[in-house]
Amino acid sequence: MNHTENLTNKDAIDKLKSLVEDILVCLFCTNLKTDDGATSRPMSALKVCDQGNVWFFSEKNSDKNQAIEADNKVQLFFSHPGKSRYLIVNGEAEIMFDKAKIEELWTPVAKIWFEQGKDDPDISVIKVTPNTAYYWDTDGNRMINLLKMAAS
């Protein structure tokens, strides 16, 4: 049996938060419109805020940041095969150099990529504002839910 449910506003954001917190690592895709296909790389989501934005750290001169500057449309693919949960987020990315936001999002694990810590000159923050998100929660091989989420 296949069930579809549309969530908006707070319900959508709450569901997005719970899924991202459970999965954390996603494939972060840029260059969505190229003939060679999208460019994807694994990224750890830091937080989903109350507005529904998904936050990441990135090196300021990375290929990813350059791709976002050229075209800010992105897709995030989260997958938890052990729990049969899958999430796709379509949105727009913005690169920021906000020290207060870096301080807010900082975790000790981030020092693996940014050896100088919160003050590393190469650190940037990426904010992904979702336009839509689709979530599948399956029980074995059976589809249970497909949720369409639109963050406000």
What are these regions (language model features)?
Residues 31-33, 59-61, 79-81, 90-94:
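Histidine- and/or cysteine-centered catalytic micro-motif in compact active-site loops
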Residues 18-35, 74-78:
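A short, Trp-centered hydrophobic/proline-enriched beta-strand micro-motif
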Residues 1-25:
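N-terminal leader/targeting segments and the immediate start of mature chains
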Residues 23-25, 52-54, 71-74, 84, ...:
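Short, surface-exposed beta-edge/turn micro-motifs
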Residues 1-8, 89-152:
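Charged, gly/pro-rich active-site loop segments
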